């Protein structure tokens, strides 16, 4: 009988598969050559809170790069970045590149054509 199960347990159980699925991102240079392949597990609220604590600010762009360094993985599951890489990434690569990776990480679909028409 299902009603004895806690609602939180039902929800957690319902998303178990999603929590173990990683999404793959090929980071390419301007000529289309793959520089690195990053893997992203789903981001939890806890991940975001930890990144915010590490960033020491409410500034969204700082937090998202901290989050990137915290959650991005190599194929074998090891971290793709060190936490100390965040400031370097923010200073030394084009904003568009960092933005694209972070939008993918957050699983945010950006429809450019629609955005331009609004």
What are these regions (language model features)?
Residues 5, 15, 29-30, 94:
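Alpha-helical interaction segments
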Residues 15-23, 65-67:
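A short, compositionally biased
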Residues 20-33:
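Short acidic-hydrophobic surface loop/beta-edge motif
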